[in-house]
């Protein structure tokens, strides 16, 4: 089997992934509230919206601007003293994201390696629902210090949660 070298996201101490097996369970709301709570207790926090197909951070934080770039790196947008990045900052809200796996993987690598995250105690990663290319890229390449799986209490949903937990092991 192939061995993967997992690296931390540059400029960060701890990476916390917020994931779910299904959409619409409150994952993005939880991720933003966790980021705000950590900020409130004095931590330096970043929030990465890794949901390429359905980014919600621009709406949740009312961000309508585009990040600055020096041609090599993207500068996170600061809102509520939290460093933020989302594909939603780079595309029009009406533009459908019809990307295949390699494009998604490339975008995730850009957000984890080419964003100028600065001196963060925590970066909260709002993952898309399910176990697709985004989750695989993170699980294989990024050092994840903790994962929180958000779910509803139905038995079938909890079975999916167990599978999701194994992915981050």
What are the functions of these language-model segments?
Residues 44-99, 105, 112:
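Phosphate-binding loop that captures ATP/GTP phosphates
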Residues 15, 41, 59-64, 88, ...:
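Conserved, well-folded catalytic cores of nucleic-acid-processing
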Residues 1-21:
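Extreme N-terminal, non-catalytic leader segments
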Residues 114, 121-122, 128-169:
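Conserved catalytic-core segment of NTP-binding enzymes
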Residues 12, 23, 49, 57, ...:
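Residue-level signature of catalytic and energy-coupling elements of molecular machines
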Residues 91-134:
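Cytosolic-facing regulatory segments adjacent to core modules
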Residues 14-51, 165:
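Walker A/P-loop phosphate-binding motif and the immediately C-terminal alpha-helix
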Residues 9, 54, 71, 101, ...:
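Amphipathic alpha-helical transducer elements in NTP-driven molecular machines
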């Amino acid at each position: 089997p192939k061995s993967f070298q997992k690296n931390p996201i540059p400029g960060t101490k701890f990476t916390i992934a917020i994931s779910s097996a299904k959409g619409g369970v409150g994952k993005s709301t939880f991720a933003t509230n966790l980021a705000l709570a950590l900020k409130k207790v004095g931590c330096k926090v970043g929030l990465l919206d890794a949901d390429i197909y359905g980014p919600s951070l621009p709406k949740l934080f009312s961000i309508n601007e585009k990040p600055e770039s020096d041609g090599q790196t993207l500068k996170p947008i600061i809102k509520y003293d939290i460093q933020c990045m989302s594909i939603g900052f780079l595309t029009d809200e009406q533009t459908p994201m019809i990307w295949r796996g390699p494009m998604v993987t490339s975008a995730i690598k850009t957000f984890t390696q080419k964003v100028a995250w600065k001196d963060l105690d925590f970066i909260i990663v709002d993952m898309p629902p399910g176990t697709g290319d985004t989750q695989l890229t993170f699980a294989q390449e990024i050092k994840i210090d903790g994962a929180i799986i958000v779910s509803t209490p139905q038995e079938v949903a909890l079975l999916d949660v167990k599978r999701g937990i194994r992915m981050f092991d």
